[in-house]
Amino acid sequence: MPHHEFECSKVIPERKKHAVIKGKGETLADALPQGYLNTIPGSISERGCAYCGAKHVIGTPMKDVIHISHGPVGCTYDTWQTKRYISDNDNFQLKYTYATDVKEKHIVFGAEKLLKQNIIEAFKAFPQIKRMTIYQTCATALIGDDINAIAEEVMEEMPEVDIFVCNSPGFAGPSQSGGHHKINIAWINQKVGTVEPEITGDHVINYVGEYNIQGDQEVMVDYFKRMGIQVLSTFTGNGSYDGLRAMHRAHLNVLECARSAEYICNELRVRYGIPRLDIDGFGFKPLADSLRKIGMFFGIEDRAKAIIDEEVARWKPELDWYKERLMGKKVCLWPGGSKLWHWAHVIEEEMGLKVVSVYIKFGHQGDMEKGIARCGEGTLAIDDPNELEGLEALEMLKPDIILTGKRPGEVAKKVRVPYLNAHAYHNGPYKGFEGWVRFARDIYNAIYSPIHQLSGIDITKDNAPEWGNGFRTRQMLSDGNLSDAVRNSETLRQYTGGYDSVSKLREREYPAFERKVG
């Protein structure tokens, strides 16, 4: 597994150890990219900071909370509305965010009075909201503002409110992953065990590491409820503040994103004896295996099987329609964290795509190990790439699509490579059986968009293609080399779900399973 040196990074020789190409028959012991280290000076990283990891990734998806950042307004703006973590309370946490808007004079004279004033103003502006999270930033951490003391003062003066303090300034780790750890531990130290919940079922879980991107959480909770499982809390997408204070009463922690939330799961196991079960909501087989594991834990395998059989029968013909048309298409899998290994194997097995590159921005060595292990020979693996390295990789690999975030994705579009937003999605949710078909549909739509066929044409030279009497459609582009049997199949079909697959779940009624006596 030789290290790969990018031409653009030869002036930063340390970068060579951060990229490898997987060779034939090589094992993980041969070489791995160095990872989760401080970004090398001179390499323009696309990472987020520890503050971003705490507030943007984990904190803000809590739905019934005023989120206030104690620092310059730029920190707040950078973490506002850039992910579609929706909620069933009209997306309150997406619409509003607060900043103390620290200026130079506050750096000189202190900003604790400013913070207290802002906290009180925020609660007055939203009298129906009684919960708040305060996030420390670099500027106010460096001047030593005691935000814990201010929060305690306000709670004494306003006993009906409750405030959580997250001390995770931007410099508190090499990347946003440092912030994940900070907020995990802060929450269990400050808030878990401070509310006693109503237990309504025999099977009670915390759903951990799920952020409800475009409804992912609501899709998965639908499966759990159909199995007769009470979801006590979700950490943190569409989750309630007080629900998360009651995490100590669950029977099982069901963990989705291990990179961002394994820390609180491990602490809940140590402090309260709650076991951890890792699952995967992406892909038919991983999801089916996950539901079976949960069913086995609670002794309700039959309920899991019934859901799996129903969902696979409904959606598999649609997934296979896209698989036939995506077979062999090359993809750069550049999502940043755990999606690297959640997706690496299953998009090849279930969609026919070929992964030619993986990368992490804030992941750890364990993420890269699992990702590389699930990729084939010749895969380029990169840790913390900069923009120029990304462009050079695209030129070398010539992928048909990249699955990544907005920043590298918009750069890719400039060199005529379509991308799909792996962070906030394009038309999600992508979890669940139907969601996985939506994902395949969006990949198909991106690769075969007619606009990409036109983007390489220099219209100044008057060489527009002659396409007869009409514009080419996606299916005209995708079906040219398919066999007649596939093209005319009566069993395979395109996605038939609606634009909004989440709202209907909020109105669904669930079966009432008889509780065990004693």
Curated annotation (Swiss-Prot):
<protein>
    <recommendedName>
        <fullName>Nitrogenase iron-iron protein alpha chain</fullName>
        <ecNumber>1.18.6.1</ecNumber>
    </recommendedName>
</protein>
<dbReference type="InterPro" id="IPR000510">
    <property type="entry name" value="Nase/OxRdtase_comp1"/>
</dbReference>
<feature type="binding site">
    <location>
        <position position="423"/>
    </location>
    <ligand>
        <name>[8Fe-9S-C-homocitryl] cluster</name>
    </ligand>
</feature>
<feature type="binding site">
    <location>
        <position position="49"/>
    </location>
    <ligand>
        <name>[8Fe-7S] cluster</name>
    </ligand>
</feature>
<dbReference type="InterPro" id="IPR011290">
    <property type="entry name" value="Nase_Fe-Fe_asu"/>
</dbReference>
<dbReference type="InterPro" id="IPR000318">
    <property type="entry name" value="Nase_comp1_CS"/>
</dbReference>
<keyword id="KW-0547">Nucleotide-binding</keyword>
<keyword id="KW-0535">Nitrogen fixation</keyword>
<keyword id="KW-0411">Iron-sulfur</keyword>
<dbReference type="GO" id="GO:0046872">
    <property type="term" value="F:metal ion binding"/>
</dbReference>
<keyword id="KW-0067">ATP-binding</keyword>
<dbReference type="InterPro" id="IPR010143">
    <property type="entry name" value="Nase_comp1_asu"/>
</dbReference>
<dbReference type="GO" id="GO:0009399">
    <property type="term" value="P:nitrogen fixation"/>
</dbReference>
<feature type="binding site">
    <location>
        <position position="138"/>
    </location>
    <ligand>
        <name>[8Fe-7S] cluster</name>
    </ligand>
</feature>
<feature type="binding site">
    <location>
        <position position="257"/>
    </location>
    <ligand>
        <name>[8Fe-9S-C-homocitryl] cluster</name>
    </ligand>
</feature>
<comment type="similarity">
    <text>Belongs to the NifD/NifK/NifE/NifN family.</text>
</comment>
<keyword id="KW-0408">Iron</keyword>
<dbReference type="GO" id="GO:0051536">
    <property type="term" value="F:iron-sulfur cluster binding"/>
</dbReference>
<feature type="binding site">
    <location>
        <position position="75"/>
    </location>
    <ligand>
        <name>[8Fe-7S] cluster</name>
    </ligand>
</feature>
<dbReference type="GO" id="GO:0016163">
    <property type="term" value="F:nitrogenase activity"/>
</dbReference>
<keyword id="KW-0479">Metal-binding</keyword>
<dbReference type="InterPro" id="IPR005974">
    <property type="entry name" value="Nase_asu"/>
</dbReference>
<comment type="function">
    <text>This iron-iron protein is part of the nitrogenase complex that catalyzes the key enzymatic reactions in nitrogen fixation. Other nitrogenase complexes utilize a molybdenum-iron protein or a vanadium-iron protein.</text>
</comment>
<dbReference type="Pfam" id="PF00148">
    <property type="entry name" value="Oxidored_nitro"/>
</dbReference>
<comment type="subunit">
    <text>Hexamer of two alpha, two beta, and two delta chains.</text>
</comment>
<keyword id="KW-0560">Oxidoreductase</keyword>
<dbReference type="GO" id="GO:0005524">
    <property type="term" value="F:ATP binding"/>
</dbReference>
